Amino acid sequence: MVWLFIIPGILALLILGLLVFGLIQPAKHTITCSLMLRQKPETVFALLDNVEELPSWSSTVAKVEHLPDRNGRTATRQTMKFGMVLIATTLERKPPTRLVGSMEKEGGPVWGTWTYELTPEGDGCRIAITEDGEMKNPFFRAFARLRGLDTSIKMQLTDLARKFGEVPEIK
């Protein structure tokens, strides 16, 4: 009979703990990771710019659908393999060195930009991805911190390296 009070109490404390942890995390964050590739910036930029092909090499994106342009900017709905749906809009496009896109969770409290910067180095290039994000929901902030704010960037850099048959060494 005591367990009927202990188990719900423990669950309530865990939920309260996540809420408090999320509330003390900053809503905004900036994260940058980079990777050296043995590819020309033009080759890497072309792959990143071709969003229709994203599901063929990304371990997280299942489907990409084009949406009507937003203020003259290309927009897509990207369905992740785990079910989340993001709206991505191209904000800046400077081939072959810079690509900036915004991402927002459809109907949700997550918003941010990803900036791809490609710098020639030797026979290849260094690609740096910077995420400037904002999560208003404290539970999202808590889970993002526990998961690692750089996890999505590292996954995309790993996918890029594998697409080109290279071993990822992310910095």
Where are these regions (language model features)?
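Hydrophobic ligand-binding cavity/cleft-lining segments
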Residues: 2-70
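Short coil-to-beta transition motif at edge beta-strands of beta-rich domains
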Residues: 71-75
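Beta-strand/loop substructures that line and gate deep hydrophobic ligand-binding cavities in soluble
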Residues: 103-162, 166, 170-171
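Hydrophobic-ligand binding "helix-grip"
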Residues: 3-10, 14, 23-26, 56, ...
